[in-house]
């Protein structure tokens, strides 16, 4: 499978959940470089404030500190967004085995909240 160049309509707005983490912050930066608007949602539990700080002065970047386990936060984050790139999750298979309820609440129910908020908000595409 080869690389395919994808373009989006002008003034498209992206939401990157987990946007203060390694992958999420790099996605935010790449999307901004393409000239699109980016909203980042992260609770900073594993993401880094420094990743937010390096982008915060860009007028096309918005940061929301919030938790995907809260549906109201997800609804606010999805408002006016065209595309959601869901990177918010707790990693580590060993820890997920040690703390399954915690991981289920965040990774499964949090993603479900994001999907429902995206559906209700009319988001065009949801990538997870």
Stretches found by the model and what they are:
Residues 1-128:
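N-terminal Rossmann-like NAD(P)+-binding domain of SDR-like oxidoreductases, especially those catalyzing
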């Amino acid at each position: 499978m080869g690389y395919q160049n994808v373009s989006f309509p002008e003034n498209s707005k992206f939401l990157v959940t987990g946007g203060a983490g390694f992958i999420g912050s790099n996605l935010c930066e790449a999307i901004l470089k393409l000239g699109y608007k980016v909203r980042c949602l992260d609770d900073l539990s594993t993401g880094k404030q420094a990743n937010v700080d390096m982008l915060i002065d860009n007028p096309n970047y918005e940061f929301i500190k919030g938790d995907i386990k809260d549906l109201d936060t997800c609804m606010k984050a999805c408002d006016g967004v065209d595309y959601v790139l869901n990177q918010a999750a707790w990693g580590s298979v060993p820890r997920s085995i040690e703390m399954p309820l915690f991981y289920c609440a965040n990774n499964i129910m949090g993603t479900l909240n994001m999907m429902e908020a995206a559906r209700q908000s009319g988001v065009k595409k949801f990538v997870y």
